[in-house]
Amino acid sequence: MAKETEMEFEGTVVEVLPNAQFKVKLENGVVINAHVSGKIRMHYIRILPGDKVTIVISPYDMTRGRITYRKIGK
């Protein structure tokens, strides 16, 4: 059985939580929990409330996601 593909969404960081976790409001209005990807962590990219980000969500758990990109300029 093939692995399901991940879905990509745009959103805005609403709240910063401990352990590099964030609450992100997607463009469709849904708020999910997200953590940063390894490359963002490795390059010490800061994510603050109000930042526009790209999120990857697995079809198996639609309540959690991974931040893969922070948009430059709000």
UniProtKB/Swiss-Prot annotation:
Residues 1-72 form the S1-like domain. Its main location: cytoplasm. It is found in: Cytoplasm. One of its GO terms (cellular component) is cytosol. InterPro entries: NA-bd_OB-fold, RNA-binding_domain_S1_IF1, S1_domain, TIF_IF1. Keywords: Cytoplasm, Initiation factor, Protein biosynthesis, RNA-binding, rRNA-binding. HAMAP family: IF_1 (MF_00075). NCBIfam families: infA. Belongs to the IF-1 family. One of the essential components for the initiation of protein synthesis. Stabilizes the binding of IF-2 and IF-3 on the 30S subunit to which N-formylmethionyl-tRNA(fMet) subsequently binds. Helps modulate mRNA selection, yielding the 30S pre-initiation complex (PIC). Upon addition of the 50S ribosomal subunit IF-1, IF-2 and IF-3 are released leaving the mature 70S translation initiation complex. PANTHER family: TRANSLATION INITIATION FACTOR IF-1, CHLOROPLASTIC. Component of the 30S ribosomal translation pre-initiation complex which assembles on the 30S ribosome in the order IF-2 and IF-3, IF-1 and N-formylmethionyl-tRNA(fMet); mRNA recruitment can occur at any time during PIC assembly. This is Translation initiation factor IF-1. It comes from Mycoplasma capricolum subsp. capricolum (strain California kid / ATCC 27343 / NCTC 10154). The gene is infA.
